[in-house]
């Protein structure tokens, strides 16, 4: 399966420390109606690090049910514990997702050989089309393009990478070494257009939580070779992309959705509400972009 276009790294709405199912379903429905290509529950933006395994399963089930087969679902199933990643991937496969988003093990700091062994074990025990997630700033380990090419060759289940190293040269090497049939997806909203210009397929996006039609439109424009329109949308989205990282993701995006009236603001510790001066700056950008 080829994953391409704009996928939303879904926030997880909470209410009284439980998943707010009503708001989660509303958010999923709005995303689909706005033209998003696909959905990614239980990623970093979904606060997966503070969700129990039962909550992971609940969020994935809700997403599958509400989506009802309309767009692909790429479920976050990664862990720094290989056996946990296998169990979550096995559940997601049995539940009926289209693929898994599997982060490189964090904190452990495995070697490149360890990364390969991790993804091989998951594929062997729970085979499912998989996009590996490389985000060195959060994990402390960088999945190198050379290793990624070996993984693609040795593990057919790995069909793509969410590349969030922030290194556009590394993105280019990923496409060069893995081939144009491999789904190299941006893990950072501000590099979507540069990545696609080098053969990347799209993005797993934070900002599409609040501007799904624009991010989907950017990807569609580039895929249809309308570079001018893609460039216009790139610059149109740029202030929002910056605003989503005024503080640690997903604090700004959940705050924005709250300000927009789409859900209540509830974060899980150790994440806390935005500092007042940053929230004020965020509101200014939302007003500028006519989202409030």
Identify the role of each PLM range.
Residues 1-8, 12-15, 19-140, 150:
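Active-site beta->alpha loop and helix N-cap motifs at the rims of alpha/beta catalytic domains
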Residues 2-13, 34-36, 197, 204-292:
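C-terminal alpha-helical cap/extension of soluble enzyme domains
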Residues 24, 56, 60, 85, ...:
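A general structural signal for well-ordered alpha-helical segments in protein cores
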Residues 28, 60, 119, 155, ...:
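Short amphipathic alpha-helical/adjacent loop interface patches that line ligand
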Residues 49, 85, 111-115, 141-144, ...:
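Alpha-helix N-cap/helix-start motif
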Residues 65-71, 94-96, 126-128, 153-157, ...:
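Short helix-capping segments at alpha-helix termini
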Residues 124, 138-242:
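Catalytic alpha/beta core domains of metabolic enzymes, predominantly
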Residues 134-135, 157, 268-269:
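Glycine-rich phosphate-binding "P-loop"
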């Amino acid at each position: 399966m080829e994953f391409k276009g704009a996928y939303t790294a879904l926030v997880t709405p909470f209410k009284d420390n439980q998943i707010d199912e009503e708001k989660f379903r509303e958010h999923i429905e709005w995303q689909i109606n706005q033209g998003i290509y696909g959905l990614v529950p239980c990623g970093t933006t979904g606060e997966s690090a503070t969700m129990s395994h039962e909550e992971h399963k609940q969020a994935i089930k809700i997403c599958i049910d509400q989506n009802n087969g309309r767009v692909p679902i790429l479920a976050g199933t990664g862990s720094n514990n290989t056996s946990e990643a296998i169990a979550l991937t096995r559940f997601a496969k049995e539940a009926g997702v289209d693929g898994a988003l599997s982060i490189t093990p964090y904190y452990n700091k495995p070697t490149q050989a360890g990364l390969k062994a991790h993804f091989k074990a998951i594929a062997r025990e729970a085979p499912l089309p998989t996009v590996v997630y490389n985000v060195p700033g959060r994990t402390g380990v960088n999945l190198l393009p050379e290793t990624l090419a070996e993984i693609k060759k040795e593990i057919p289940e790995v069909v793509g990478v969410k590349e969030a190293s922030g290194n556009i040269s590394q993105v280019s090497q990923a496409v060069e070494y893995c081939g144009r049939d491999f789904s190299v997806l941006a893990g950072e909203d501000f590099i979507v257009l540069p990545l696609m210009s080098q053969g990347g397929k799209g993005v797993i996006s934070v900002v599409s939580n609040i501007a799904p039609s624009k991010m989907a439109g950017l990807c569609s424009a580039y895929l249809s070779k309308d570079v001018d329109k893609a460039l216009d949308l790139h610059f149109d989205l740029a202030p929002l992309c910056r605003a989503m990282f005024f503080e640690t993701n997903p604090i700004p995006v959940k705050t924005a959705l709250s300000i927009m009236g789409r859900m209540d603001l509830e974060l899980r510790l150790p994440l806390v509400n935005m500092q007042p001066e940053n929230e004020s700056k965020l509101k200014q950008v939302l007003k500028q972009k006519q989202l409030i």
